[in-house]
Amino acid sequence: VILYLVMASIGYFCISEERRSIQNGVRRRLKVSYAILFFVWLFLAVYRYVGYESGIIIGGNDAPTYIDYFQTCLAGKGNNIYFVRTEPLFQIMTKAVRTITSNYHVYFALIYGLIIFSYLRFIDEFDLLQSNKTPLFMLVFPFIQSFCAIRTHITIALILLAIVALKNRRNILMWGLLIASVFIQRASLIYAIFPIFYFYYKKNKMTMKKATAFIIIGCAVGYIG
């Protein structure tokens, strides 16, 4: 709880500073407040305590499993379920980092660095602080959830960056990020097909039959994923 309060407080301070700069008409290329938020949140996420206390997992429900997978991924399948069900790109990414180091903090730094960067990039690109500082302040909650669902939040990060690429008409980058998100976690396919609808239906009318069909397809894809 103390960790979360510290993160929220630092987030509030940095957000207030950035919004004050925006209101004063200052648009700095290097946003110091974002940098402070990035590195503090990254440090707290990477070096948080992960373990068991009285049979209860501390530091995120999935965190011990991911650490175990990272440390044993080069040794063979073993008994770790992630060797069986994890998507190929996540396995490749994990093994690539493990080849360089056995320190899981480095692994976490890369993962949470991507997640935090995607949040800040998305908010900055769409000027979400222009009228309200609440969106960035509220990011502490999904970020904390990433402690328990690492792969899910990696895919969310890639999708957010893909939306930024879409806004800037960098379509090749957008598709690359969306495809990567599916090969990190297949359930993200339901979100990755968003640009197809965007490109097609910005010039075509959406009917009730089509909307119903897409909902059914989306539910099926989500269930399969």
Pin down the residues of each PLM region.
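Short hydrophobic/aromatic helix or loop-helix immediately within or flanking a transmembrane segment
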Residues: 63-75, 79-102
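Transmembrane-helix signature of polytopic, membrane-embedded enzymes
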Residues: 28, 120-140
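Membrane-embedded helix bundles of polyisoprenyl
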Residues: 132-160, 187
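Transmembrane-embedded, aromatic-rich helix segments that form part
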Residues: 174-177, 187-198
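Loop-to-helix entry region of an early transmembrane alpha helix in multi-pass inner-membrane enzymes
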Residues: 88, 100-117
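Start-transfer (signal-anchor) and selected internal transmembrane alpha helices
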Residues: 1-41
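Membrane-interface transmembrane helices that cradle and orient dolichyl/undecaprenyl
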Residues: 159-173
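Alpha-helical transmembrane segments and terminal signal-anchor/GPI-anchor hydrophobic tails
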Residues: 58-68, 91, 195-225
